[in-house]
Amino acid sequence: MASRPSRVSAIAAASAAPAARASRTAARQARDNREALRADQRFDYSAIVDRPPLKVPRGVRLIVWPVVNIEEWEITRPMPRQYSSPPGGQSIVPDVQNWGWHEYGMRVGIWRIIESFRRHRIRPTMSINARVCETRPRVAQAALDAGWEFMAHTYVQMPIHQVEDQRAMIRQSVDVLRGFTGRTPTGWLGPGRGQTPATLDYVAEAGFKWFGDWVMDEQPFDVQTKHGPLLSIPYSVELNDIQIMVSSLHESDGMLRRARDAFDTLHRESKHGVRILSFGVHPYISGAAHRIRYFDAMLAYMRRQPGVVFWQGETIHDWYRDATRMGA
């Protein structure tokens, strides 16, 4: 029989083990960030006017990449964003008002968004926190049944620089999405498009092929990582209902007007080389009763123009790989 001091030592050692693991993980992540390439070292500059035209299927001029963001906001944390500031401007937990604003999207707004895409025969990409598959399986299943693409968007919505073990979080996200859909996700979007210096190395290491965090182009381009190239697919920060409706406080038709103007420009310019127009929406914003008619009108406007296709991220990735291989 073990003596009391031995038992106490064993308990102390067991208690210290998680802290030691966390310390090693933090040290490794800090080292990875120090050794990682800077963002501006991961790609070569390329002026779009200097590039040879990319081959596209006959009749295609403009690729539209629609993205719907489905997130898990934990009521025990500060909210990822606020529509209404608490009295006195102090952040509070639980922030019931802003949490409820987001939850409206999961209970009401998402069903309007799903119906609008169904009516226009468009299957978007869904940027999804993996935990949604566990806490809101009704939403995730409806998207899966509608043929939406699942793009990994971390496990739960929180700043990426606060994640203690990014590798583990990325693996967890992949495992949950694969278990729910039966397919391994190929695309990644960071929360708030956030990254630490080493994030893209972790993403490539986990087997992802493409990501949407960088907004600096209207065509895909390769980004270098320690584990081979990742394809950056341009995901617009300007055509996003957060920036338009929440940050800039536009009227309910603000996204329709901006999207129509952007679409017309890219559709005209695409005569000289294919362009990608992307837009991002959130169910608690675009799915609101006073905005859904304008969201639907935006889809209708794009749908009726000639030479336009609506593609998911993996389709864009595969097309670009084939197009650049043929042009090599």
Regions from the language model: what does each represent?
Residues 24-232, 256-279, 285-328:
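Catalytic alpha-helical scaffold of carbohydrate-active enzymes acting on polysaccharides/glycoconjugates
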Residues 1-25:
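Short amphipathic, positively biased membrane-proximal segments
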